[in-house]
Amino acid sequence: MARLCRRVPCALLLGLAAVLLKARLVPAAARAELSRSDLSLIQQQQQQQQQQQLQEQKQREEAEEGRPEVPGASSTLVAPVSVFMLKVQVNDIVSRQYLSQAVVEVFVNYSKTNSTVTRSNGAVLIKVPYQLGLSLTIVAYKDGYVLTSLPWKTGRMPIYSSVTLSLFPQSQANIWLFEDTVLITGKLADAKSQPSVQFSKAFIKLPDNHHISNVTGYLTVLHQFLKVDSFLPATGVTYKSGLENVELTPHAAICVKIYSGGKELKVDGSIHVSLPLLHTSNIKIGDRIPAWTFDMNAGVWVHHGWGTVKEHNSHLIWTYDAPHLGYWIAAPSPATLDFGINDDFQDITAYHTVFLTAILGGTIVIIIGFFAILLCYCRGKCATPQKRERNITKLEILKRDQTTSTTHINHISSVKTALKAEDKPQLFNAKTSSYSPQRKETTKTEAEERISMVKTRDNFKIYNEDVSFLSVNHNYSRNPTQSLEPSMGSKQPKHINNNLSPSLGDAQEEKRYLTGTEEVYGRSHIPEQLMHIYSQPIAILQTSDLFSMPEQLHAAKSATLPRKGQLVYGQLMEPVNRENFTQTLPKMPMHSHVQAPDAREEDIVLEGQQSLPSQTSDWSRYSNSLLESVSVPGTLNEAVVMTPFSSELQGISEQTLLELSKGKPPHPRAWFVSLDGKPVAQVRHSFIDLKKGKRTQSNDTSLDSGVDMNEHQSSRKLEREKTFIKSMHQPKILYLEDLDLSSSESGTTVCSPEDPALRHILEGGSGVIIEHPGEESPGRKSTVEDFEANTSPTKKRGRPPPLAKRDSKTNIWKKREERPLIPLN
C-alpha cells in the first residue's frame, strides 16, 4: 500500500507539469500564427487599394477619352487649379424680379463643374475652379422660362466675380390636335406671318392616367428682343477641325415645349418648324441658314442641319425640319457661311461644268462634221477631172468567132440615157481593142490608137433606119421619117440616116461643119451609127453537133434572111400575113437623144473615094479591120451594142439559117446560105472595085462567104465546138421587112424585094407577093416631104442643110436597081 501511495502523487505531478508545459506552448504558436496573418492581410489590403486606384484611373481615362477634345484643355489637372468666387443673380427680363429656385450651371472647357439653385433673393455663390486659357460658360434656366447662357473668358485670374442673367418667359401657344398631326402656333399680334410647329401625333408619349386634353404647348419667339439687340450673344461650336468656338448672331430663335400635368414631355421625330425672319438686306429667298440647338451636356450651341429661306405672304420665313422639340436658333456664322458658300459654289460649278462640257462637246462634233463634209466635197471636186468613166467606148472589143465566121463587136452593154454635162465629152472618148480566142493584142502606142480609131470610123459604118409599119390594103412600105418605139409603140420623128453617098462638094461642106462642131463640143470621131443597128445579111458557119436540140433549132433562125410571115421569139406564136417577109429593127430609144453633129460623119467619103460615083457602097471598109479569113459584114452580130435586141438577133439569124439548110448534108468546113439556097460553088457575084488603084493586096477569099479558102481547118475546129446560142425568155415580136442589102467588095450578096432569088424563097406559101416598083411612087415622096416639113426644129438640130437636101432627094431602091446581079456559072 505504501508503494501505491508513493506512485500516485508522482504521476499526478508529472501530469500537471505536462499540462503546464502544453499550456505555455499553445499561446506562443497562436501568437506566431496571428502575427503572420496580420502581415498577409495588410499586404492584401494594400494590393486591393492599388487595384482600385488603377481601376479608377482607367475609368477616368476612359471618361476623358469619351469627351471631345478641346484646344487648351487637359485630361487631368496637372497644374494646381485656382479657385475663385462667382456670384450669379437670376431675374425675369420682363418684370425685373428675382427668380428663386432657378438652376445655375457652370461649364469649364465644355465640362460641367458646378450645378446649384438660387436662393430666395435669386442669387447664388459658387466656387469655380478655373485655369487661364480655358472657356467658361454660365447657364441659368427655370420652368416657364427660356434658357439663357453666358459665355465668359478672361486673360487674368479673377478672385471674385458677380454676373446677372435675365430669363425670357415662355409664351403659351395655340395647340391644335388632329387625328394624325399636332399643330402649335404663336400669338404674335404684330407679325404678318405666325410661327408654327407641326409634327405627327404619334410622337407624343403620354404618361399613364394622362389624357391628351391635359397637354399644354409653349412657343416662344425671341425676335421682339432681337429688335432692340437685347438678345445675349451666343457661342457656337463647329467640328471643322476639332472643337472651334464661333460667335453667333441669331436672325431668329424659337423655343417649343409641351407639358402634361406640370411635367415636360419629350418629343423626338421629324418636326417641321416655320419661323419668320427679321428684314435684313443680306438674306434672300433660297438662302440656306444653319440651325443651332443648345447642348445641355456641353453648355454650348451646336450646329445641326440647314434651314431654307422662303417667302410666305410677302414675308421671309425660315423653314427647318428639327429632330426634336427644344430651343433652336437660325444664325449664320463665318465658318458655316463658308461651308454653305463652298457647297453652293461646288454645286453651281458642277452644274455649269456639265453644261459647258456638253456645249463644248457638241461644238466640237459640229466642227468635225463640217470639216469632214468640206473634205469630202473638196476631194470630190479635185477627183472629178481625173475620173475617166467609160460609159460608151469605140468598139471596146473586136472579136472574131471562127465557128460561125462572123464578127462580134462587144460593147459595154449598159449605156446611160442621162449623162452629166462634164461626162459628155468623155462619152465618145475610149480606146479600141480587138482580140480573138487565139490571141490578144498588147497595149498600143498612141499613134496606133489614132490609126485604129480612123479605121474603126471608116470600116464600121452601120446603116440604121427608123422603121414604122403602115398597113394600107395589105401593102407595107417603108417610112423613113418615123420610128417604132418598143416601149409603148409611140411614134416620134427622129433624124434619119439613109446612108446616101454625098457628092464631093456636099461632103467637103459637111466635113467642115462636123469638124467645127467637134471642136466646139469636144466629141470624138465615133459615129452615132454605131449605136443604131440595121439588119444586114450575114454568113454563118454550121457544125453538125451544135444544133442538135430542138429547142435550140427553134430559136436559131436568121434575123437577116427574108422569109414570109411573122417571127415570134418566145412562147407566144400568132398567125401573120406572108407579106411581112423581112425584118428591120427600130432605132434604140435610149440612143435617140445622143444624136450629135458627128452622127452624119459616116456619110463623108474619105480621100481615096471622093472621086467615085455616089452609087458606090461603103461595105468595102469592113475588110480593112477584119482578120485575114473573114470579110463578112458583122452588122447583125454587132447588135450586141443594143442590149435589148442583142440575143434575139443572134438567135433569130441562126434559126432562119438552119431552116433554110435543112435536109442537106453538112459541108466539111462551112455552109454559106445564099438567098436562093445554092451552095458556095454555084454562087458568084459581081462586085465593083471602089479602090482600083489604091488596093494593092487582097486575100484569096470567097466572094460570097468571105472565108479564106487557103486557111487551115485545124485552128477553127475547136472554136466551132465552143459556139453556143443565147436565147431570151421574153417574148419579142419582130416583123420582117425588106432590107437594104448592099454589096461591096467584101463579097456579100445584095438583094431587094425585086430579086428573083428572094421571090423564089418567099413563094413557099400561098398568095402573091406585091413587088415594089423601081421608082418611088409620088404618094410616097409626098409623104416623106410632108413629114420632113412637119418635123420639129428640135429634132433637126445639128443637121447640116446639104445633108437634109441629099436625104430628101436620094432613093434607096433606086440605088439597088443600079447594081446589076450577074450570075457566073
From Swiss-Prot:
Signal peptide: 1-32
Membrane association type: Single-pass type I membrane protein
Compartments reported by the entry: Cytoplasmic granule; Membrane
Superkingdom assignment: Eukaryota
A Pfam family per the record: FAM171A1-2-B_C
Coarse class of the protein's main subcellular location: cytoplasm
Sites of Phosphoserine modification: S792
Disordered, as annotated region: 52-74, 693-717, 770-825
Gene Ontology CC: one annotated term: membrane
Residue ranges that the UniProt entry lists as topological domain Extracellular: 33-353
Stretches assigned to the Cytoplasmic side: 375-825
Keywords carried by this UniProt record: Glycoprotein, Membrane, Phosphoprotein, Signal, Transmembrane, Transmembrane helix
Bilayer-crossing regions: 354-374
The keyword tRNA-binding belongs to this UniProt entry's keyword annotation: no
Composition bias, Basic and acidic residues: 57-68, 772-784, 804-825
Tissue-by-tissue expression: Expressed in the brain, predominantly in the thalamus, in the hippocampal formation (in CA1, CA2 and CA3 regions and in the dentate gyrus), in the cerebellum (in Purkinje and granule cell layers, as well as neurons of the deep cerebellar nuclei) and cerebral cortex (at protein level). Expressed predominantly in neurons.
Glycosylated residue positions: N109, N114, N214
Family: Belongs to the FAM171 family.
Name of the protein in its database record: Protein FAM171B
